[in-house]
Each structure stands twice: as structure tokens, then as C-alpha cells.
């Protein structure tokens, strides 16, 4: 008889962590929703999210793993030498897109079945969707942002574009559903759009309400397989000059393919080889006269696009929080399965303290993301007070910058909590850390968002209303402290009369 462990099929094998229904396993999310939603809305939303939490864990997760294993590739030429610049993705990536449409990840925010609370429902569903999506959540963020921007276009070419695109951006039918890009970053920079070089030349007679052709390089375009995009460019004057600075930028709508199905005068220079988000197609593009339509007033591109960016920053916040929630959920399950020094890892006090600290961080961030969603929903429906608007203006950059940094630090703890297994690629844990890193870069880095928060305070005078509300909430919370302390004291007294099972788990025996 061979000794245990003598062969690759003998000896100890560690059970892998298991993912249960992602909604039922997120107590803080459920509590936040129950607190924010009216009773009838809570009943509907709870049923929808309970069902979807199972789908995210069972159907979506294997699709996401497949999409990650087979990243997109660029095919420059067909068999006969014709330039095609086709980005090939896996069927799994396409199926995840279909699920996004079927589940109404974008549509919920525009169907408004629960009025101002629809954004809360939508963002809670995104919270469950994102960690199982192979970053399909990225094109959804830009799609939602474009939908919100176009929804506000009520005149001129922008209104005509909205009539064509908005029903597609908000559809639940996968055969109709469009996603949108957001082509801002150029070689000159991302957040500093004032140095953008793309030029728009007025041309008459273009199809699909086109008003201009675009010429320039877009250095970092995520979700390049989308059907349309919003982008910035400088309108060329009749004398060939272009206006400088951010005030010289105008906003344009462009469809990525012409009526013949070919790219609309777009050349894909290369796909980006990134640290993470490997399943997400990200490309460097050359616009060679791409037909586009001016949206909004000339030279007002940056103010116009603010409606879009507020949405994408909220998506970033939700994705950061939900990614860490997924990591902690797996770490907790692993801790119940992994035994060290004769006890489950979950009974080792130091490890338990580490997980508890992450849970505390997640609790606050989950409440924050849902609160921001509630404010956005009120603004969408015209029910936001002046204080609501001020709070949303300030919290949007602050929530994004804080949760993104929190996500990177927290995911590093998650990797460490798995020990060596957390450093091995085929467990999927290292990928979670790499993917978390982009969330502090997308939609503005920490410093850029800090400056935006400063503008909200100085220019928009948002701090006063926010502090006033914070003091009011703190006062209400303080009134509840005595009762909470009494309950804690009672629990402590009961606990002191019994010896907890973790008492003998540390330090480990040296025998």
C-alpha cells in the first residue's frame, strides 16, 4: 500500500470555496434596500434579486470564466487580403451581453417601474451582476451614461439621435439592445480632455442625421465592440482653424459601423495588453472621417457630457464595492473549509479579525453606494431637492475615489487570506486583484476626483447642505446609541458566561 500523498491522486485535497446565491448571501445589501424602498417596491425587488442572485452564481460565473480564458483578438485581414479590423470575442462574452439585456441592467433605470426608486433596484442588480460578468459591466456603464445623456436631448439633431438610439440602449431584447462606447482618452491624456486633438469637419448629406466627419486618434477605448459611442472633438472653422482648450470641445454621437456593416471609417490600430480586465476589448483607434452627429451646442461638449460621467462614476462605485463583496464572500467560505493548526481558519482569531475588518468597510460602502443610487433616482425623476442635488454632486466623486482605493486594498487582503492559493492563477483570485486596480483609474484617478470634489465645494457650494444633513443624521444615530449599548452589554454578559470555541484555537500547540 502506498503512503498517503505518495501519488497525485492520493492524500489531502482542499475543497474549493463555493459561491451561494449572491443576494441571499449579502445581508447588508438586503438591509440597505429594505431601509430605502417602500414596502411594495421592496417586495418586487427582493423577488427579482433573489432569482437573479442564483443566476449570477450558477449561469453567469462559468460564462465569465470562459470569457476570461479566451480574451478578444484582432483580425486585421480576411482570407483574401481585405482589411476588416474585426475584434473576435467568445460566445460566452456575447451571452453575458444577452443576459445583461434580458435582466434589464440598463433598462430598469429607464422603465422606472418604481419611480425614483428604480435606480436603487438597478444598482442593486448591478451589484450582483458585475462580479460574474467578465467586466461586461464596463460597456453597460457607458451605455447607461449615454442613455441618460440622450434622454435629456429635446431639440435639434440630438433629439433625432435620441429617438434612434435610446430605445436600443434601454431594450431588454438582446437582438435589439445596443451598448455604447465613451471615446475620450487620447494620446495627450484622459482626464485632461482640454488637450484633445480630434477634429470634426462639417459635411452635408451624411446618413443617419450625420453632421460632421471625425479625424483623430483615440488611444484607449473600452468596449470597442459597441454599436455606438459618445466622443469629443473640436469643430474645424471654415478657415481651417480649431478652438483650443476644453471650451473648444463639442460632443458627438457616432455609430461604429456603416449601413454596409463595415467599420465607419475607423481603423483599429491595436488591442491593449492590460494588467487586468482581459476579457474586455480595449483598443487604440484611428478615426479617418468617421460620420458623427453634433449633440448639444458647439463648444459645450464638456458640460453636456457631465450627465454621462455622473452615471459611469456611480457604476464604478458599485463595481468596486461588489467586487470586494465577492472576494470577501469567497474568503469567508474558504475560511470555513480550510483547517490550520487543528481548527477551521474561520476560528482563528487573527484571521477572523481580518475578515471582520473587511466586513465593516463593506458595510459602510454598501450603504453609501445605495444612498448615491437613491439620490440619482430622485434627480432622474425630478423629485430631488436642492440639498439632494448638492449631496449627489459631492458624493459622486468622493464615493468613486474612496471605494476604488478601498477595493484595491481590500482585494489584496482577500488574496492574502487564501495563502498560496490566492497567488495561483487558476483559482481566479489573482484576477480579482488585477481587475480591481482599474477602478481607481477609470472615470478619473483619485487626485482628479479630489479636485472635482473641491470644485463641488468651492464652485457649487455643495459642502454646506451635505454637512447639515450629516449632522442631522449623526444626531439621530446618537439618540439610538444608549439602546444599542444596552443590547451590546446584555450580549456581552451572556457571552462572558460561556467559553467561546475560538478561545483554544490560538496560539497553536507546539506538540
Task: Cite the ranges covered by each PLM segment.
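Extended amphipathic alpha-helical segments enriched in small hydrophobics
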Residues: 313-381, 464-489, 498, 502-511
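A glycine-rich, basic-preceded beta-loop-alpha segment at the flavin cofactor/substrate interface
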Residues: 114, 259-265, 269, 274, ...
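Alpha-helix capping/hinge segments and adjacent helical runs
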Residues: 4-8, 24, 43-47, 51-58, ...
Amino acid at each position: 500500500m502506498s503512503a498517503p500523498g505518495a501519488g497525485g491522486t492520493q492524500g489531502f485535497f482542499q475543497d474549493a470555496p463555493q459561491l451561494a446565491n449572491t443576494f441571499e448571501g449579502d445581508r447588508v445589501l438586503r438591509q440597505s434596500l429594505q431601509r430605502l424602498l417602500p414596502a411594495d417596491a421592496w417586495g418586487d425587488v427582493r423577488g427579482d434579486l433573489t432569482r437573479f442572485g442564483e443566476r449570477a452564481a450558477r449561469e453567469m460565473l462559468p460564462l465569465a470564466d470562459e470569457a476570461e480564458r479566451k480574451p478578444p483578438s484582432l483580425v486585421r485581414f480576411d482570407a483574401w487580403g481585405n482589411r476588416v479590423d474585426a475584434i473576435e470575442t467568445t460566445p460566452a462574452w456575447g451571452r453575458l451581453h444577452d443576459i445583461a439585456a434580458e435582466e434589464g441592467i440598463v433598462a430598469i433605470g429607464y422603465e422606472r417601474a418604481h419611480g425614483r426608486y428604480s435606480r436603487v433596484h438597478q444598482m442593486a442588480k448591478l451589484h450582483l451582476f458585475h462580479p460574474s460578468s467578465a467586466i461586461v459591466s464596463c460597456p453597460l456603464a457607458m451605455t447607461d451614461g449615454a442613455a441618460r445623456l440622450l434622454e435629456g436631448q429635446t431639440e435639434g439633431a440630438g433629439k433625432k439621435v435620441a429617438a434612434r438610439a435610446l430605445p436600443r440602449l434601454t431594450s431588454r431584447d438582446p437582438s435589439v439592445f445596443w451598448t455604447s462606447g465613451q471615446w475620450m482618452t487620447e494620446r495627450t491624456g484622459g482626464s485632461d480632455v482640454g488637450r484633445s486633438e480630434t477634429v470634426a469637419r462639417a459635411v452635408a448629406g451624411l446618413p443617419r442625421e450625420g453632421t460632421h466627419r471625425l479625424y483623430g486618434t483615440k488611444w484607449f477605448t473600452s468596449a470597442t465592440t459597441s454599436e455606438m459611442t459618445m466622443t469629443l472633438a473640436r469643430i474645424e472653422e471654415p478657415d481651417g482653424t480649431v478652438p483650443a482648450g476644453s471650451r473648444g470641445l463639442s460632443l458627438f454621437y457616432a455609430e461604429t459601423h456603416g449601413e454596409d456593416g463595415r467599420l465607419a471609417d475607423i481603423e483599429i490600430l491595436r488591442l491593449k495588453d492590460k494588467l487586468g480586465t482581459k476579457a474586455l476589448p480595449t483598443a487604440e483607434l484611428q478615426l479617418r472621417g468617421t460620420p458623427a452627429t453634433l449633440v448639444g451646442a458647439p463648444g459645450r461638449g464638456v458640460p453636456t457630457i457631465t450627465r454621462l460621467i455622473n452615471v459611469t462614476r456611480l457604476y464604478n462605485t458599485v463595481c468596486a464595492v461588489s467586487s470586494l463583496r465577492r472576494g470577501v464572500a469567497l474568503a469567508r467560505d474558504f475560511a470555513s473549509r480550510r483547517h490550520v493548526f487543528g481548527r477551521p481558519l474561520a476560528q482563528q482569531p487573527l484571521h477572523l479579525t481580518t475578515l471582520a475588518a473587511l466586513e465593516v468597510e463593506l458595510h459602510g460602502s454598501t450603504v453609501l453606494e445605495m444612498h448615491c443610487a437613491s439620490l440619482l433616482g430622485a434627480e432622474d425623476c425630478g423629485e430631488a431637492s436642492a440639498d439632494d442635488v448638492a449631496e449627489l454632486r459631492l458624493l459622486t466623486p468622493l464615493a468613486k475615489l474612496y471605494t476604488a482605493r478601498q477595493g484595491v486594498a481590500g482585494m489584496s487582503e482577500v488574496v492574502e487570506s487564501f495563502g498560496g492559493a490566492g497567488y495561483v492563477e487558476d483559482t481566479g483570485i489573482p484576477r480579482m486583484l488585477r481587475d480591481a486596480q482599474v477602478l481607481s483609474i477609470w472615470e478619473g484617478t483619485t487626485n482628479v476626483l479630489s479636485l472635482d470634489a473641491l470644485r463641488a465645494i468651492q464652485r457649487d457650494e455643495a459642502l454646506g447642505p451635505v454637512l447639515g444633513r450629516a449632522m442631522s443624521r449623526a444626531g439621530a444615530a446618537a439618540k439610538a446609541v444608549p439602546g444599542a449599548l444596552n443590547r451590546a452589554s446584555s450580549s456581552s454578559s451572556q457571552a462572558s458566561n460561556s467559553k467561546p470555541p475560538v478561545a483554544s484555537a490560538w496560539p497553536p500547540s507546539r506538540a
